[in-house]
Amino acid sequence: MASNESLQTTAAMAPVTIERRVNPNLDDELPKPFLPRALVAVDTEHPSGTPGHQHGDMSVLQQHVAFSNRNNDGIVYPWETFLGFRAVGFNIIISFFGCLIINIFLSYPTLPGWIPSPFFPIYIDRIHRAKHGSDSEVYDTEGRFVPAKFEEIFTKNAKTHPDKLSFSELWNLTEHNRNALDPLGWIAAKLEWFLLYSLAKDPHGFVPKEAARGVFDGSLFEFCEKSRKVKQATVKSLTFKI
């Protein structure tokens, strides 16, 4: 049987381990939390993943990207990324710059060959090659979802509410995850979490845990798109009645 010291998650000489705590009993709340999940994004509230979300035999990282693959051919072009941004509710300016940044920086690592493409396509089957540093490590290097790392986002950073993150807590999250000499990773992480905050914050200015989890498997994007369509249909119906 392991000694108490061998199971300690804090060290007195390393105050950061006390400030940013982990859940020592996570395996009581979620089966095999350190096992990377290839197909579903699970947490303590959703041990089977997102209800109704179809994984299509894709990795969780691939599912995240596949939302923007509007014609389902396995390749995401800049104009598809733009349409994906628009589908979830971002304005034209954010959508335009978002598609440029994402496709310019992520295209080349996913290409099947060495010659760059002027169309900046992102190949979904190779998206794991485009994983940047200074991230939360919720995706492993093959694009699987690591539940323990996802839970750490909240145990380490959610100081106001255990299942929500404020803007300042999201900022601190990106600061805590910084790797040395990785400016591109620092910027990418902040942009990603800023976009999530803009998209999913509640009326009190917090990002719920469920929204954060939904980003990783793309189910949040699907929810936002469906919600916008319902809202647009309702407005259109009311307009006709008037």
UniProtKB/Swiss-Prot annotation:
Cofactor(s), names only, from the UniProt record: heme b; Ca(2+)
Domain of life per record: Eukaryota
Binding site for heme: 64
Function: Calcium-binding peroxygenase involved in the degradation of storage lipid in oil bodies.
Keyword Secreted assigned: no
Chain span(s) of sequence motif Proline-knot: 112-121
Native source organism of the sequence: Pinus massoniana (Chinese red pine)
GO BP field: negative regulation of lipid storage
Protein name: Peroxygenase
Domain EF-hand: 56-91
InterPro entries per record: Caleosin-related
GO molecular function: calcium ion binding; heme binding; monooxygenase activity; plant seed peroxygenase activity; protein homodimerization activity
Protein family membership: Belongs to the caleosin family.
Expression sites by tissue: Expressed in megagametophytes (at protein level).
Enzyme class: oxidoreductase
Modified residues (N-acetylalanine): 2
Note describing how the cofactor binds: Binds 1 heme b (iron(II)-protoporphyrin IX) group.
Gene Ontology CC annotation, any one: membrane
